[in-house]
Amino acid sequence: MHYSIIRKLVTAPKLANVPKRKWKSVVGLEVHAQIASASKLFSGSGTSFGAPLNSSVAYFDASIPGTLPVLNRKCVESGIKTSLALGCRVNEVSMFDRKHYFYADLPNGYQITQQRAALANDGKMTFPVITPGKKVYYKTAKLLQLQLEQDSGKSLHDDYLKRSLVDLNRAGLPLMELVFAPDLETGEEAASLVKELILILRRLQTCSCKMEEGALRVDANISIHQEGDPLGVRTEVKNIGSVRSISQAITYEINRQLETVANGGVITNETRNWDAENRRTVAMRDKEVLQDYRFMPEPNLPPLHVNLKPGSMSTEDLLSVAALSEEIPELPEDTRQRLVEQHNLNAETAIILVNEPILLDHFLSITRSLSDLPNKVICNFLINDLLTYCNKLNLDVEDCSIKADDLKDILMSLHAELINLQAARQLVDLLHNNPKAKVSELIELHSLQQICSPDEIENLCQLAIANQAKAVEQYQKGKAKALFAIAGEVAKLSSQKANMKLVVQRLEKLLKPTNK
């Protein structure tokens, strides 16, 4: 936000005629996270993204008569670990149900899910909300339930040949559905929740969270109402494909509903699609007629039992929640607290580092190697220089080819005053484009050494004084800021290589009234 979120959250276009009365927006999220598993939820077929069409399909996935589901133990473990990390109550017994509906890419005619008794309930997420230009604050959203379910296949529509094709590679992929209470109010809060969830799931290694591959899908339920009134009619927005789009889609939909009310219209209960190209929501289908999914118990799967006893161990046929809780790593908020308490970072810096795991890795690696280098100097360089450089290239930090050892060498050279900040920034660009090069070689090759020689500094200052006569006069009349113009002239004359600390010190001595 980068903060990696700050970079990615872009406010959606504002609409006209928004009512001026006090209205509140209410947002609830449903998140489908694909479990990181080598095989599907109820079959042994593979889960690789991008596999040839219909190449990862078991008989069960294609609904061949006589085939039965076999529950994937790894998926249950991942579901339990995720539930614990999100503060849920894991249920000792959960059950599977059939949810009936007809799609061409759902060969069974039903989806196996957990409607009546989910794997876990009653969790919550507390997360930092980062809004450009505003102070960071924390928000809490309740997690109503986390359930296991299978994904459907994928329909491919060929308009030219007027036909539809079905790819069943996705059919049966393992999903965790996380249903959050409508505790959010803005698009920024929703995007921040999803960003935090991504950080948690990646720490747990229970989901890749690659939204571009469909590994994490977000639906938003949005409504508006006047303060003190019951909740309004909600709309559901689907097809939100990125963290940035979550903020944009929800912000747009809130404004659309406000404008509709201002113009005397009525909000209808409908499903809308997010059109990322035109940055607007588009009506898909009504939800006014409640669809009957005819939920019924899944007869081919027994109730799922887990062991809730403290200190218990998992066995071949019974998973221990206590044992799985021992496998949960440090979570993002714990890392933020550690950075604040042990490394004396401020809260906002800690949030930025945790939001960008590669920056956090670089920071911890550098602090271990360069204990005498102030943490503030390291953070400033990583955030203000490396991150800014990546943002300008529209590049994720993890895709930047600069290694942690190279960053250490740059910071060591900077701290030793061998180079200045301008040269350090130049080295970032050079190393990204030449990842095999060494910092010392690049400094020599491009003559990036800082000018620290007293004689050279003296000559440069004298030239700058001669070139900036007006600024010199202003400075000697008491306008202290005029010194910046003279120092800037030195930087220009030295091709940004002069040690500016020494330059300022020398200029102050040269321009004292007694030195006229």
From Swiss-Prot:
GO biological process entries: glutaminyl-tRNAGln biosynthesis via transamidation; mitochondrial translation
Q: Which UniProt keywords apply?
A: ATP-binding, Ligase, Mitochondrion, Nucleotide-binding, Protein biosynthesis
Q: Which InterPro entries match?
A: Asn/Gln-tRNA_amidoTrfase_suB/E, Asn/Gln-tRNA_Trfase_suB/E_cat, Asn/Gln_amidotransferase, Asn/Gln_tRNA_amidoTrase-B-like, GatB, GatB_Yqey_C_2, Gln_synth/guanido_kin_cat_dom
Q: What is its main location?
A: mitochondrion
Q: Where, per UniProt, does this protein localize?
A: Mitochondrion
Catalytic activities: L-glutamyl-tRNA(Gln) + L-glutamine + ATP + H2O = L-glutaminyl-tRNA(Gln) + L-glutamate + ADP + phosphate + H(+)
Identify the stretch annotated as signal peptide in this record.
none
Q: Name one GO molecular function term.
A: ATP binding
Task: Show the GO cellular component annotation of the record.
Answer: glutamyl-tRNA(Gln) amidotransferase complex; mitochondrion
EC number(s) reported in the record:
6.3.5.-
- Pfam families listed in its UniProt record: GatB_N, GatB_Yqey
Misc note: This protein may be expected to contain an N-terminal transit peptide but none has been predicted.
The UniProt function text for this chain reads:
Allows the formation of correctly charged Gln-tRNA(Gln) through the transamidation of misacylated Glu-tRNA(Gln) in the mitochondria. The reaction takes place in the presence of glutamine and ATP through an activated gamma-phospho-Glu-tRNA(Gln).
Which NCBIfam families does the entry link to? gatB, PRK05477.1-2, PRK05477.1-4
Family per similarity comment:
Belongs to the GatB/GatE family. GatB subfamily.
Q: How does it assemble?
A: Subunit of the heterotrimeric GatCAB amidotransferase (AdT) complex, composed of A, B and C subunits.
**The protein's name in its UniProt record:** Glutamyl-tRNA(Gln) amidotransferase subunit B, mitochondrial
Organism from which the protein derives? Drosophila melanogaster (Fruit fly)
